[in-house]
Amino acid sequence: YIDYGIMIAYNVLTGGFMTKKIAVLVNEDTMQRCSCGGCLKAYMNKVDSFERYADEDTELVGFTHSGGDLEKKLASFKKNGVTTIHLSTCTRGKNDNYESIARQCAAAGFDVVGYTHGGAVSKDGKVAIELVGESK
């Protein structure tokens, strides 16, 4: 016979059954005219920047733009268990504050992946940022 209570407790303590909670921050101006299909397709198919989660359960907890009150958004992500924030590929390519946004996310304790779809190096040679949250 299997004691499911012990099995569940074991998996919780060892990280089994854990779902990695992810959020995506998109460039505010781009979001006004983009359906975000590239970001969502990459997430759903676990390709490009999301390939690293191929063998993990993931949940997309937040998907919003980086404008407005970013501190409030980060607090909401934290409250909802997000551990990793992906900055959209358009943020890397079109937002002058890309590096600052990445650092702000890391300072709030999140791991940061600096792109969503396409390559880690953009067509114009810009390399995606990868940061580990500072409070870890």
Describe each PLM feature range.
Residues 1-17:
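Short, Lys/Arg-enriched N-terminal segments with co-localized hydrophobic residues
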Residues 7, 59-61, 111:
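Flanking helices and flexible, charged tails adjoining ferredoxin-like Fe-S electron-transfer domains
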Residues 18-77, 88-97, 118, 127-128, ...:
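Conserved mixed alpha/beta catalytic, RNA-binding, or beta-rich assembly cores of soluble enzyme
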Residues 80:
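Active-site charged/polar residues at nucleotide-handling catalytic sites that mediate phosphoryl
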Residues 83-84:
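Structural motif
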Residues 100, 104-136:
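Ser/Thr/Gly-rich flexible loops in soluble cytosolic domains mediating phosphotransfer, phosphorylation
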